[in-house]
Regions:
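Conserved, mostly hydrophobic/aromatic
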Residues: 30, 72, 138, 199, ...
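Pocket-flanking alpha-helical
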Residues: 91-94, 138
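Gly/Ser/Thr-rich helix-start
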Residues: 39, 95, 157
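N-terminal basic, low-complexity leaders that serve as flexible interaction/assembly modules and, when applicable
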Residues: 7-92, 144
Length: 208
């Protein structure tokens, strides 16, 4: 999955990753991994048992904070990545999203402009507020590490999220999405434009 990354910094402490990104020279190379949190960690597998529903897990500040911090605690990485999922956006928009064990995410497909218009973006930030609460707690916990790790925000790229919303889940060839985009670009762009707007708001709120 392609993701948009942003740095969430609310402290004046020097952070290796931020300084290197700003062009400063260091003998040490900052390290973070795209999938540094999650199922490869035994402590995550134990933590995951505390919530039957994966989206509920993502919306729980307590659980998402711990999932974010676990790889920092284990590997001393230079940045934590906000533990979340790209499908919180369609879920917040009102699309039916379910994570089925053994199958992955299943969504009620968006098939036309009428389906797009049923999506409600007015309360997205309110719906996602537990994620922003988690960010505040993550920042506080990261201060406990002497090497001052940064925090990288998280959201799915609009095209990637759109493919899940249109296909109703993962796909090998994304035929339905590509067909709609090529045959009715003005219709499909309404979904992309909506996702660009909502995702931008979500990322800005992560910084604020």
């Amino acid at each position: 999955r392609r993701t948009k990354l942003l740095m969430i910094e609310k402290t004046k402490q020097k952070k290796l990753l931020i300084e290197v990104l700003n062009g400063d020279k260091h003998d040490q190379i900052p390290i973070w991994l795209m999938r540094q949190a999650g199922r490869h960690l035994p402590e995550y597998k134990k933590l995951r048992l505390e919530s039957e529903n994966f989206l509920d897990f993502c919306y729980s500040p307590k659980l998402s904070v711990e999932a974010t911090i676990q790889p920092i605690r284990r590997y001393n990485l230079d940045a934590a990545i906000l533990f979340s999922d790209i499908l919180v956006i369609p879920d917040a928009l009102g699309q039916q999203v379910e994570f089925v064990p053994g199958k992955g995410p299943i969504l009620k497909p968006i098939t036309n402009v009428s389906s797009i218009k049923k999506l409600n973006q007015r309360k997205v930030l309110q719906y996602l507020s537990p994620i922003y609460q988690a960010i505040e707690k993550i920042i506080d916990q990261l201060k406990m590490f002497s090497f001052n790790p940064s925090l990288i925000g998280f959201a799915g790229a609009p095209w990637t999220v759109a493919t899940y919303m249109v296909e109703g889940g993962s796909s090998k060839d994304y035929h339905t999405t590509r067909k709609w985009a090529y045959e009715s670009p003005h219709e499909f762009s309404q979904l992309i434009d909506l996702l660009v707007d909502v995702t931008s708001q979500h990322l800005i709120q992560q910084i604020d």
